[in-house]
């Protein structure tokens, strides 16, 4: 979590770090006589520029990946959307989901877990992830779906997402919009 925040901060302020590093290089070059060589100044400024370029390039690559992931996940969700809400509204306590309905829900759970994995790795922005969590919350109001979801979370097969982590994600998501 701390590294993710640092990464986002670095991406946002890489230009400020560049400015500070170049300023420090010039101050050191000016005040320390042993450093009065153009090679020191060139190396220090070049290194600072390279670091800034790396951060900017990494950010652009991650933005591209984020766009691809967002498109892929939204496409998969859109393909499931109608059936998912029909199931949510039609499945009541009087019956268990059929094997086809369970298979469909497992596909949805896998989509949710994949989204979580990419969020945890820092490739899905928190605002997007928590919007998705709030969307999941709407589906999980159905007690049968929620029961199956918790049973699946207990298996430990969803990329590290557990009941405890899910509860924390729900709590955090409530600060981004929909309250339970």
Where are these regions (language model features)?
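Membrane-embedded hydrophobic alpha-helical segments
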Residues: 10-64, 68
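Amphipathic alpha-helical "stem/stalk" segments
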Residues: 2-11, 59-180
């Amino acid at each position: 979590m701390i590294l993710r925040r640092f990464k986002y901060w670095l991406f946002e302020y890489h230009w400020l770090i560049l400015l500070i590093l170049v300023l420090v290089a010039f101050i050191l070059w000016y005040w320390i006589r042993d450093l009065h060589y153009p090679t020191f100044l060139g190396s220090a400024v070049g290194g600072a520029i390279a670091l800034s370029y790396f951060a900017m390039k990494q950010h652009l690559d991650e933005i591209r990946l984020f766009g691809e992931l967002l498109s892929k996940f939204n496409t998969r969700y859109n393909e499931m959307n109608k059936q998912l809400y029909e199931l949510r509204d039609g499945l009541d306590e009087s019956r268990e989901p059929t094997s086809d309905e369970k298979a469909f829900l497992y596909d949805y759970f896998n989509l949710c877990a994949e989204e979580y994995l990419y969020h945890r790795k820092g490739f899905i922005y928190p605002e997007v992830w928590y919007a998705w969590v709030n969307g999941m919350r709407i589906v999980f109001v159905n007690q049968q779906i929620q029961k199956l979801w918790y049973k699946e979370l207990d298996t430990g097969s969803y990329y590290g997402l557990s009941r405890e982590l899910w509860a924390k994600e729900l709590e955090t998501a409530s600060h981004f919009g929909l309250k339970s």
